[in-house]
Regions:
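Membrane interfacial helix motifs at helix-loop boundaries and amphipathic/re-entrant anchors
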Residues: 2-14, 56-76
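Short, glycine/serine-rich, charged loops/turns that create anion-binding
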Residues: 46-49, 110, 155
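Aromatic/acidic, Gly/Pro-rich catalytic loop(s) in extracytoplasmic/lumenal soluble domains
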Residues: 87-89, 96, 128-207
Length: 207
């Protein structure tokens, strides 16, 4: 699974078979022994509590400790999306009107692309494109797009794909949670050196 680029949690459903196999000997071990049953119940209670805190969004975002995001990065990665979209929107809205008319958004991953699509209403953002995983197959921006607001592509400024790129901001979730997007650049890139349909294969990446 990992060799093909899958996430490490994809095969976790197989753990159910191990739990099922373990239930019989545990039940035999605890049967008729009040102290063993008490130990088992206490262990289960601790396991459930830790699992809830590590897996579900139960804590206020400002209280999420680094230990939890280290165990389950998904917790940290679920924080800050509305703020990130607002910051990208400000970068787009700061463009001159002529640039906004020929602008697109390009993101480094599907999470950013999804957030921009989800929270776009009210901002009037242009179309979103990404070369990440299967989003690449939706195709490139039109060749008429001369300006790109590029999110979370750290090497875009040195790629040579555009005549100019400038970092105009950095993503900040506002609560100090160090997740995958925190601190990533928001860049404005102008004048692609080649048509988008020729550049697009360079944007493709799987992870």
């Amino acid at each position: 699974m990992l060799a093909t680029g899958g996430q490490p949690y994809y095969p976790f459903a197989l753990l159910l078979t191990l739990y099922a196999a373990g239930c019989v000997p545990v039940a035999r071990w605890a049967a008729g022994h009040a102290r063993r049953i008490a130990v088992l119940v206490a262990a289960l209670a601790v396991s459930v509590a830790v699992s809830i805190l590590a897996s579900l969004p139960m804590l206020p975002v400002r209280s999420v400790p680094a230990a939890i995001t280290a165990v389950n990065s998904t917790d940290g990665d679920s924080i800050g999306w509305p703020a990130y979209v607002a910051q990208v929107a400000r970068a787009y809205q700061a463009l001159p009107a002529a640039d906004r008319a020929v602008a697109v958004l390009v993101t480094g991953n599907y999470g950013e692309a999804g957030a921009l699509a989800r929270y776009d209403p009210g901002y009037g953002l242009p179309a979103v494109y990404s070369g990440h995983n299967e989003l690449y197959r939706f195709g490139p921006p039109p060749d008429s797009a001369r300006v790109a607001v590029v999110v979370s592509m750290r090497d875009i400024g040195t790629s040579g794909w555009f005549a100019e790129c400038a970092t105009v901001g950095r993503l900040d979730n506002g609560v100090g949670v160090d997740n995958e997007e925190q601190g990533d650049p928001i860049c404005v890139c102008r004048n692609p050196r080649r048509p988008w349909h020729e550049l697009w294969p360079s944007f493709q990446h799987y992870d």
